[in-house]
Amino acid sequence: DNLIPLALAAIVLFVLYMAYRKARQARRERLIDSYRFPESIAAKVGKTYPHLNDAEVMRVMQGLREYFHLCNMAGRRMVSMPSQAVDVAWHEFILFTRKYEHFCGKALGRFLHHTPAEAMRSPTSAQVGIKTAWRLSCLREGMQPRAAHRLPLLFAIDAQLNIADGFRYALDCKRSPGDDYCAGHIGCSSGC
């Protein structure tokens, strides 16, 4: 007799918790979309890559927003940074320590540390992180990660903007130059 009210209470609590999580996720997404980054971040990107015009610098800033969306979706899982240009913007944002800490707390619910690949716990951490970035990027752009028909923004931007020290990815690994990372392997290797 007492189990029915307890079961109903548990169901109600679960539904309320799920509604809270959904509302929190939507609030964080709106914050990431509307956040005004310090103007000097875009200036730093432009100084680092002087061949970029204003629209291309803004594309890098959009990439930074996109990266934060991926981190928000990933929760506490590590997401590797697929773009060198966007990484420059992220580094510059980190220098605004109070603003960065406040943004992370509100947009991600935690402080997002920047960990170089060399300092990761294990050699496979970066691989897991790039697979997470690939999967979430594809999902955000409406593609199945194992059957992407194009590169998502964060995987395409360095090549599109001709970033000399950038990361380059290719969907078709057989047709790509030898310097490209094979995105096909990221999307469909075992362990994805």
Task: List where the protein language model places each region.
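Acidic, Ser/Thr/Pro-rich intrinsically disordered cytosolic tails and loops
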Residues: 1-192
